[in-house]
């Protein structure tokens, strides 16, 4: 599966929730009027785009339609896609050109912070960079052990202290190890304690001073990990962390399991925070760099599938649809054949070792025929 296909599949629920609903609504109108805009704004708000961002999108759409003299409602989706694509543009690149560069990863418990670090380490290593991890979240129980598992999976070294240790000391030792091993990138886990913002700011401030002293002039990223499934709560978290830490980018996880992926729009529009990566699955390679155009294309792909097409393109569209159906049928047939082969092979495979495992435990063959009271009777005789 290609990168775009991964993003497209990961956004399926969000696409159905936002552009799918909007397409159905637009197709029910024969002209563009204020009622259409009101329904559009309502659908955007329901899609976790947020009130302010929904209003901004509708205002931009009114302006574009007026400037272009558009009167056909079926053309709205194309304009909407262009607006969203423009809104998503930003500094989406990861800036790690110095050696070493450092990435601090923050986020509340349960958003996929540790998993993101492991996947990011694996991705950077796959790009030819040498990576080292620092377990500086010494506050959360089991955080160090979980990061250790991901470090092993990614095949990168991990610097750790005991639970409750000074996070800044962990960062200091990780920097020292990175220098000694000539590593390209340092990724440090940090605690995300929003319930005590003062402690969080103090901790990050101390870590920042260590980095400034030990790695002056190095490239530094502070990535906030957010769970897309939390919808507007993710925006609130971003706002809180933004006031406590110098966030340089967002990692939006679990997009594949939620229809609330529209939350990326208010994060970028209202807070001005660029999205650097998105998580579209559970596999190691499902952490994808954020591509605004690919995201917009995947989000509005429903237009190509369901919205009306103009007459000149209908033949080409029908041919494309038939080809897609043929490929899907071939794929389904191949999967069915593979499943049939798998069903045939495991049965003898599982039956052969079964007697070997049971033989030592159930030596007397008639054991299955014994009455339930027999073991009790035998036990009394032995006593």
Language-model regions, residue ranges each:
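Solvent-exposed amphipathic alpha-helical surface segments
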Residues: 87-91, 214, 306
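C-terminal lobe/tail of nucleotide-utilizing enzymes
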Residues: 244, 248-360, 365-377, 381-383
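Primarily NTPase-proximal linker/entry elements flanking Walker-type ATP/GTP-binding cores
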Residues: 9, 13-136, 143-163, 169-179, ...
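Short glycine/serine/threonine-rich phosphate/pyrophosphate-binding segments
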Residues: 111-118, 141-143, 233-235, 258-262
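Polybasic, Ser/Thr-rich amphipathic helices
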Residues: 1-22, 26, 363-383
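Short glycine-rich anion-binding loops that position phosphate/pyrophosphate groups of nucleotides
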Residues: 191-193
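Short hydrophobic/aromatic residue motifs in ordered secondary structure
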Residues: 51-53, 140, 256, 284
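Conserved catalytic-core segment of NTP-binding enzymes
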Residues: 167-181, 195-304
């Amino acid at each position: 599966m290609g990168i775009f296909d991964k993003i497209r599949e990961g956004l399926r629920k969000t696409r159905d929730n936002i552009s799918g609903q909007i397409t159905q609504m637009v197709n029910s109108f024969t002209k563009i009027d204020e009622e259409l805009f009101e329904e559009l704004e309502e659908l955007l708000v329901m899609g976790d785009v947020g009130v302010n961002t929904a209003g901004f999108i509708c205002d931009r759409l009114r302006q574009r339609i007026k400037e272009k003299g558009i009167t056909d409602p079926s053309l709205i989706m194309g304009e909407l896609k262009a607006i969203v694509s423009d809104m998503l543009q930003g500094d989406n690149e990861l800036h790690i050109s110095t050696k070493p560069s450092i990435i601090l990863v923050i986020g509340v418990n349960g958003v996929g912070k540790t998993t993101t670090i492991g996947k990011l380490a694996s991705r950077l290593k796959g790009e030819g960079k040498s990576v080292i991890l620092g377990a500086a979240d010494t506050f959360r129980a089991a955080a160090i052990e979980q990061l250790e598992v991901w470090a092993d999976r990614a095949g990168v070294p991990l610097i750790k202290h005991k639970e409750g240790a000074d996070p800044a000391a962990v960062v200091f030792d990780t920097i020292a190890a990175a220098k000694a091993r000539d590593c390209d990138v340092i990724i440090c886990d940090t605690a995300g304690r929003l319930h005590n913002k003062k402690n969080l700011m103090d901790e990050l401030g101390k870590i920042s001073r260590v980095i400034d002293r030990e790695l002056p002039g190095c490239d530094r990223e502070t990535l906030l990990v957010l769970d897309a499934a939390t919808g507007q709560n993710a925006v609130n978290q971003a706002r809180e962390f933004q006031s406590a830490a110098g966030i340089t980018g967002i990692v939006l996880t679990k997009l594949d399991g939620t229809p609330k992926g529209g939350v990326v729009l208010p994060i970028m529009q209202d807070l001005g925070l660029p999205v650097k990566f998105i998580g579209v699955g559970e596999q190691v390679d499902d952490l994808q760099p954020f591509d605004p155009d690919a995201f917009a294309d995947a989000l509005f792909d429903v237009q190509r599938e369901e919205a009306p097409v103009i007459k000149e393109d209908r033949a080409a569209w029908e041919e494309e649809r038939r080809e897609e159906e043929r490929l899907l049928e071939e794929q389904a047939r191949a999967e069915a054949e593979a499943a049939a082969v798998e069903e045939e092979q495991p049965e003898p495979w599982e039956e052969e070792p079964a007697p070997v495992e049971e033989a030592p435990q159930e030596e007397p063959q008639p054991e299955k025929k014994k009455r339930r009271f027999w073991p009790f009777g035998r036990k009394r005789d032995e006593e």
